[in-house]
Curated annotation (Swiss-Prot):
It comes from Anaplasma marginale (strain Florida). This is Glutamyl-tRNA(Gln) amidotransferase subunit A. The keyword Endoplasmic reticulum does not apply. The gene is gatA. Belongs to the amidase family. GatA subfamily. GO terms for molecular function: ATP binding; glutaminyl-tRNA synthase (glutamine-hydrolyzing) activity.
Amino acid sequence: MKRELLKLSILEAHRCLKNKDFSARELTEAYIGAVEQDTLNAFVTTTPELALAAADRTDGLLQRGEPIHPMSGIPVGVKDLFCTKGVRTTACSNILKNFVPTYESTVSQKLWDSGAVMLGKLNMDEFAMGSSNTYSCFGPVKNPWKGTEGKDLTPGGSSGGSSAAVAGLLCAGALGSDTGGSVRQPAALCGVVGAKPTYGRCSRWGMIAYASSLDQAGVLARTVEDAAVMLNAICGYDQKDSTSSQEAVPDFLGGISRDVRGVRIGIPKEYELPKNRGDIAAMWDQNIKHLLDCGAEIVEISLPHTTYALPVYYILASSEASSNLARYDGIRYGTRVEGETIDEMYELTRSLNFGEEVKRRMLIGAYTLSSGYRRAYYDKAQRVRCLVIRDFEEAFKKVDCILALTTPVEATGIEEPLSAMDRYFTDVFTVPASLAGLPAISVPAGLSERKLPMALQVIGNYHDECGMLNLAAVIYEHSGGVLQHLHGF
């Protein structure tokens, strides 16, 4: 019985709770049991007492016959980048390993206000810098998928704990963050749905900053409808975030009609499929044919400056990171290493407690912001970013949504030696939408020859999450998802 509860989607569990097929406490206990047996290293902090208390509140509402939100009583995990009041929040870095916030992030508070149940905090790449979830002070996360080779694989990153937990049936949904693809890429590698809304739709207040002009909260779930429900719960204006959008938030779930007749889908000619990959080409062709059969129109578009998106992203993100992470010095909070002078204390605290990838990106950022090189790198990157945005604006005059691969590769082995450049390249299809602040979603679309998930990415126009989700739902319905191949449902 408990195993069957774990297989339910958020909306299925919601219907069962309303029908009193089981209680929120029973559902939560099933997930707590699964988390206790976690072999993926997905959770870094667990909160079973808080979870059961939240479940009991939902059961109380049901017993009194009061209406409940679709997220009420639903067990979820929270990426360890979001501050949770009274619960350790580390960004998976030694420099914050004992930090306990005194306040709650806006997006997690919105989840709790909807009645969601927090199972705990999820592993991630340190300070969200990475695409493999191997850069964590708590150790790497394992992908639930093994493929034909049967070896331990990375779940992607930086929200690797979130994607692995959802795919591994350790939570019904999860909060993640997406700076350059950190929700969509791990969702693709783990065979789940990962969505980021338009920049500003979700408050960044209480989310530990990596690159402030790019950071955006997102969600990971098993179905597109579940992602829509979670997005509705966390989106909305917040006066505590100066970049928060005041655009009204529509009913994302209600916008999913699966009618794509006349919808113009743009295919960027610059987004080439990987060569010598017949399985990816076949998956792509099958989905294009299905969309045409459903009445959609396929339009070739050009995004000429996306060729430069990846280097532009790493210049800008690293520059912002070097500024944002300057605050971690061991003085007011976080880990401190004593030295004979204050300068020595700063040096020891930061050099011994930041991981190698974080230090690499901070050094890149310090270099690109330095007086002798800022104009050549940072200022030029900002100008190219404007050109990338202009490309998308021109494209959306011709199309309603844009379709692309989420990532050019499947999950790689945890022990597989990859250079930093190889890892950066996994974000090549996700970074452009982040630079432009556009909503985007990754949808599982089939299995590769290695029996690993492949995914498509739908990019929507600004504040058109409904159109994006509707097209994604059609793609998901065609593939049927992929988790049934992993769990037998």
